[in-house]
Amino acid sequence: MKKITLLLLGATCALSAGAQIRLGDGQLSGSFETNSIYYVDDAKMTDVAGYAVPEDRFGSNNYLKLDYNYGRFSAGIQMEAYMPMLLGFNEIPDAFHGFKLASKYVQWQDENFGILVGDIYDQFGNGLIFRSYEDRALGFNNSLEGVRGTYNFGNYVQFKGLYGRPRLYMDYEDSWIRGADLSVSLADIFGLRDAMFTLEGSYVNRFQKIDEEKSLHQGVSDQVRPNLNMYSGRLNLDWKGITARFEYVTKGEDDLFSVGAKGNVAKGNVYLAELGYSHKGFSVLGSFRRLEHMATLLSIYGEGTGNLINYIPALTRQYTYLLTNLNPYQVNPDGELGGQVDVYYSLRNKSARYKYWNLHANFSTYYTLKENTQNNKANLLWRDINVDVERQWNRSLKTSLLLS
């Protein structure tokens, strides 16, 4: 039977609405978002592989969020309905389906102390060892169902600890995440008023019972242990236009889940450094990162792109225009080495501030780690050199020129 391919979106509807209501001394706020599409065939492109017509021509992702605030107390829920989920929303069949109370929380927050019970969204440092967040456009939500406590000792010390089980698509996994994050402001302790200087550290543990039958079926290494530990140390400095950020991450032995390496274990690490300077209309920022074996899963038995506990962004230029974003860089979590340099200068007319020139240049490049290649050489993964000039001629005319 000839397969009919689906290529044309016949009707698309995206709607978002919000409201606030006063309830005595409290306040109730709500928002509703729906993204719905009706699919039709494109008869001229029926031979393109990979786009089959779904059983239901209609796809709809819907989110209803309600929050109540009363002084230092707050509570909220989020309902989600996939009727069914949009085509191509996730590579896992039925990852999102039906109608469900997807998240909920109850929170108390005063000046120095806070506690939250429910679904937690948080991040330690740059997110290299832990980040729980929601991105509806990508169908991503890895919140933790559990408890989080925070404590601030003035501006000197900030501490938070959390414990919970992670969400994977519409359900919660059988793994458990616990972690703590500490930030100490040395600038405040020593009275350095013109600077921001902090030392920070984080710890994250993933615990999951080993199922030998599942491990054998999914090709998980028999060397994987129930406990996985990760540590992060960070230094942050801001002083008279100078910015410096350093972070080192170490990760215990974990299964290598990449194609061709699954069934083996290895330790992971990250070196991250950022140096920048800004003065008036000029700024320059350089970033360097080396990482190895940092794909950290919520569950060793989970599947899909939603099965991640950490966040490793691409340190490359994020373009404004669609054409230049057709081939973005994808981070290689198995191992990469590289960075970027970004330079910006703005020249403004002193008598007419709305008239200006913006000059911008960026260079980024990444290589594989030679230890992970068969020829023991670092191979080029990505290189991008770009320059753009933006000119605001008057209040109604602006031109942009980009070379990449």
PLM region spans:
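Positively charged n-region of N-terminal signal peptides that target proteins for export
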Residues: 1-4
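Hydrophobic h-region of N-terminal signal peptides that target proteins for export
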Residues: 10-18
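Signature for the C-terminal beta-barrel architecture of outer-membrane proteins
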Residues: 21-27, 33, 37-59, 69, ...
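Histidine-anchored nucleotide/phosphate-binding helix
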Residues: 62-66
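Extended catalytic core of nucleotide-activated donor transferases of GT-like folds
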Residues: 100-102
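N-terminal accessory beta-strand-rich subdomains and adjacent acidic, glycine-rich linkers
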Residues: 104-107
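Acidic, small-polar-rich N-terminal luminal/periplasmic segments of exported/outer-membrane proteins
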Residues: 120, 124, 133-134
